[in-house]
Amino acid sequence: MKIKNSLKSLKARHRDNRLVRRKGRMYIINKLNPRFKARQG
C-alpha cells in the first residue's frame, strides 16, 4: 500500500479506483487490481 499526502493523482491511475473514508483516513481501493491500494498520510 502506498502512503501519499494527496490521493488525487493516485485515483486517476486506474478507472476502477474508489475513494473511501475509514476511521477518519482516506483510502484508495481497487477490487480488480489490489496493487493500486493507497492511504492518505
Swiss-Prot record:
Record keywords:
Ribonucleoprotein, Ribosomal protein
Q: Which SUPFAM superfamilies match?
A: Ribosomal protein L36 (SSF57840)
- The disulfides recorded in the entry are none
Q: Which GO terms describe its biological process?
A: translation
- Kindly indicate whether the keyword Zinc belongs to this entry: no
Asked if Ribosomal protein is a keyword of the record, the answer is yes
GO CC annotations on file: ribonucleoprotein complex; ribosome
HAMAP family given for it? Ribosomal_bL36
Indicate what this protein is called per its UniProt record: Large ribosomal subunit protein bL36
Biological classification of the source: Bacteria, Pseudomonadati, Pseudomonadota, Alphaproteobacteria, Hyphomicrobiales
